[in-house]
Amino acid sequence: MPKQADYTWGAKKNLDTIACLPEDVKQFKDLLYAMHGFTATEEEPTSEVQPGAILKGTVVDISKDFVVVDVGLKSEGVIPMSEFIDSSEGLSVGAEVEVYLDQTEDEEGKVVLSREKATRQRQWEYILAHCEEGSIVKGQITRKVKGGLIVDIGMEAFLPGSQIDNKKIKNLDDYVGKVCEFKILKINVDRRNVVVSRRELLEAERISKKAELIEQITIGERRKGIVKNITDFGVFLDLDGIDGLLHITDMTWKRIRHPSEMVELNQELEVIILSVDKEKGRVALGLKQKEHNPWEDIEKKYPPGKRVRGKIVKLLPYGAFIEIEEGIEGLIHVSEMSWVKNIVDPNEVVNKGDEVEVVVLSIQKDEGKISLGLKQTEHNPWDNIEEKYPIGLRVTAEIKNLTNYGAFVELEPGIEGLIHISDMSWIKKVSHPSELFKKGNTVEAVILSVDKESKKITLGVKQLTPNPWDEIEAMFPVGSDISGIVTKITAFGAFVELQNGIEGLIHVSKLSDKPFAKIEDILSIGDKVSAKVIKLDPDHKKVSLSIKEFLAHGGHAGQDAEEETSSNRD
């Protein structure tokens, strides 16, 4: 019989330690009790109780700081009142409570009990019995800890910072005290801890709400949203759970550089639904579509050639934007700012904020572009340029600039012409205009050509006098004797300046019958020499001379050819 009693007690003990049982399981427990011949309230032998068991006890005394509980062992247990804090209002002598057996006997021979450990054990058993990873539980956020928050779900669970919300968190303290639903992410049986997530539920709710809202949204309807993000290309709005994009081109009919010029974060906007992509969950929004499109009748309102006034609102390297009415801007390109000046920077002509009169040049309605002209409000001096500067007209102009290929002169403010290096002298080979001209000086020249379309005028200085090469054969007939000054010595001969500045060349082979090592042995720059004209080439502006021929025909070295000719006549 004792074995039977021991057996039945052991069974009853095992049943008592089953925690957090649902009602149907408790009924099953009572049935097992009856099968073994005892009731749930029957006294239990104390010899079998081991530390770690949860026992039912009776409150026998209550003081300010302690509660004394009798669990039927050889001594009573004293438990701090702080462990009954959640149930202290209903606590009274004679009340039945569950406690955890820490020790059957301490150093003083007393039983050590814990109400708090019993509660935690029951909570843990409840979690194991009723919950699993993925379960949804309700709890209250109680405090902030390193890396997240603590949530009371019947026991303490950890809510990582990354799982608190699906939006950016500024202050964790704002969440303390909130009662929310959480999803159990992980249950660690060995460590007896639970990790939960609020973000996953919020995200699931958002996705569900987004899908529902996507089905409800219709193109053309008006909706209110909150600005949640501003980018260079547009604004993202929260439409009560679904994000919509308000592109910068759909914000206003006028031109803006950045969306922040019109909106700010957390601002509420009423927008129009432009398009919905249900598969990708994208919604395009419009703000300017709430207003009349000023471009609808733009071609009738601003036909090409019409003069309008507007305000300069933006300057760029290539031109100036002018607002001619609310939402309508046009571009004055730098090439349309002046008839006569080569404008590099719009600031040379206009400033931001200036009010100016312009002429409509063209309209591209589909692209929302208007081309405007500033110079068209003034007379174009090139319209009658051919009448004002006919070919052959002699003019006096100021030299404004010298280049490698010529000199630019100003005929009148904004009207310039070019004297090409080849039109500077009939006889001199000019290497650079600076050999003849200086910037700022005035020069007389002749109009050679006028290109109205290209806005180009060419002038010449040498054309002021007759071309001496036209009379070269009369001036220096082949076979005649001439005199000149040596101006340059080269390896192939010596150049001699003749009448009217014309140069002739004495080739090295035509210098002397006598042998010489180098030309400088018989000639020096500045020497006056006499020679015979042996060849003329007017087309290439060349006169060929020979000292040898001069001497061979009776001339004398060092004798002036003019004197020789005179003596021969005598």
Curated annotation (Swiss-Prot):
InterPro entries: NA-bd_OB-fold, Ribos_protein_bS1-like, Ribosomal_bS1, Ribosomal_protein_S1-like, S1_domain
Single GO term (MF): mRNA binding
Family: Belongs to the bacterial ribosomal protein bS1 family.
Record keywords, A-Z: Repeat, Ribonucleoprotein, Ribosomal protein, RNA-binding
Entry keyword Transmembrane helix: no
GO cellular component, one term: cytosolic small ribosomal subunit
Organism for this UniProt entry: Chlamydia muridarum (strain MoPn / Nigg)
Domain S1 motif as annotated: residue spans: 52-116, 134-199, 220-288, 305-375, 392-462, 479-548
GO biological process, one term: translation
Functional note: Binds mRNA; thus facilitating recognition of the initiation point. It is needed to translate mRNA with a short Shine-Dalgarno (SD) purine-rich sequence.
Name of the protein: Small ribosomal subunit protein bS1
SUPFAM superfamilies: Nucleic acid-binding proteins (SSF50249)
Entry's transmembrane regions: none
